[in-house]
Regions:
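Structural alpha-helical scaffold elements that stabilize or flank donor/cofactor-binding regions
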Residues: 39, 58-61, 85, 212-213, ...
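Glycine-rich NAD(P)-binding loop of Rossmann-like domains
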Residues: 143-177, 186
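Rossmann-like adenosine-cofactor binding region
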Residues: 76-80, 194-288
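N-terminal glycine-/charge-rich "phosphate-binding" loop or analogous flexible N-terminal tail
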Residues: 1-67, 186, 324
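Phosphate/diphosphate ligand-binding glycine-rich loop within oxidoreductases
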Residues: 65-145, 159
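Rossmann-like dinucleotide-binding domain for NAD(H)/NADP(H)
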Residues: 111, 116, 245-333
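Oxidoreductase and adenylate-handling cofactor-binding alpha/beta cores
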Residues: 127-143, 183-187, 315-323
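Short acidic/histidine-rich motifs immediately flanking catalytic phosphotransfer sites
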Residues: 61-67, 86-89, 215-220, 243-246
Length: 333
């Protein structure tokens, strides 16, 4: 790779451990670079300022690394073996919260590999994207724009949100932020969560039975983390409770839904969805979701806004600095 596309600090300090960012999205280059001075005399860092999902390229770029900052790609079992068994990587710092779908955590733990994540860095970003998807389902602005551009002035009837029931499955930082936005729209918010610690003065109704959230809501928004107890927690049973005309939004993790269940429900054609997260990313060209006109798709970008990028990059750099100085900041247990 051309040297102009690499940013490297303290290259002469071969006594220091090497951190590599093998791929990155353009909007994150400057925020990351701004935090590199925090690693002075702690570690060298090498950032490749482009984005690729080519495994061979990623492995070549990380062959001398002791820590890898992971942005936008999965650490498959093959990559994990290459980096930690045949390579020297002892720490992965992920630019995201839910890492269970990005790396085999049990294997990493067994090998003594540190895995770090970032927390609450983009609660507002994800919540705003979730609500943007809700608005798109309700008002179909994208389709209206396409209509006008092709000379069609017929329009589409929208769906008003005031007074509608929004069901939140999950009520952490993101879910609470969505609830605040929904309160501003005058929506009635129903919440299911395994544990709710205070409602922060929000106008919400707690529902003990998740099935009832699906049955009663006009719009459902998912905000559960991916944990051992949440993988596949939403099944065809809940999805079948959705009323005709209702909508579901997922900006959390695809794996919290039983594999294939949402696609099958959408193929019946009487409900709509907006999805930002998928079982396989990038979404394969032959995925049946691509052929459905009752679903809005975005490429796992709910977390990506200017403020979230600043928060994320600082936490990632702090995590690797902590690792190399004996701390455990943002270490995934």
């Amino acid at each position: 790779m051309n040297e102009r596309n690499i940013i490297e600090t303290q290259p002469e300090r071969t006594d220091l451990p090497l951190i590599v960012i093998p791929v990155i999205v353009e909007s994150m280059i400057e925020p990351f670079a701004a935090n590199f001075p925090l690693l002075h005399d702690i570690a060298r860092i090498r950032m490749h300022c482009d984005f690729t999902l080519d495994t061979d390229t990623i492995l070549e770029r990380t062959k001398d690394a002791e820590a890898v900052i992971v942005i936008g790609f999965h650490i498959t079992d093959d990559i994990l073996d290459a980096m930690t068994v045949r390579g020297h990587v002892s720490c992965f710092a992920f630019g995201g919260t839910g890492v269970a779908s990005y790396i085999n955590l049990p294997v990493a733990r067994e090998r003594g590999i540190r895995v770090c994540n970032v927390v609450h860095y983009g609660d507002h970003a994800v919540a705003e994207h979730a609500f943007a998807l809700i608005m798109e389902l309700a008002r179909q602005v994208g389709r209206l724009d396409a209509q006008v551009r092709r000379g069609d002035w017929s329009g589409i009837d929208g769906i008003g949100l005031h007074g509608k029931k929004l069901g939140l499955v999950g009520f952490g930082g993101i879910g609470r932020t969505v609830a605040r936005i929904a309160n501003g729209f005058g929506m009635k918010t129903l919440v299911w969560n395994s544990h709710v610690h205070g409602i922060d003065g929000l106008d919400i109704t707690l529902i003990d039975d998740m099935d009832e959230v699906f049955a009663q809501s006009d719009i459902i928004s998912l905000h559960l983390p991916l944990l051992d107890g949440t993988a596949g927690i939403i099944t065809s049973r809940q999805l079948d409770r959705m009323r005709p005309g209702s909508m579901i939004v997922n900006t959390a993790r695809a794996e919290i839904i039983e594999p294939g269940a949402l696609t099958r429900r959408l193929q019946r054609g009487d409900v709509r969805a907006a999805i930002d997260v998928f079982d396989h990313e990038p979404l394969p060209m032959d995925d049946p979701l691509r052929s459905l006109d009752n679903v809005v798709l975005t490429p796992h970008v709910a977390w990506r806004d200017d403020e979230a990028c600043v928060n994320l990059t600082r936490q990632v750099i702090d995590a690797v600095a902590s690792y190399f100085t004996g701390g455990d900041y943002n270490a995934v247990p």
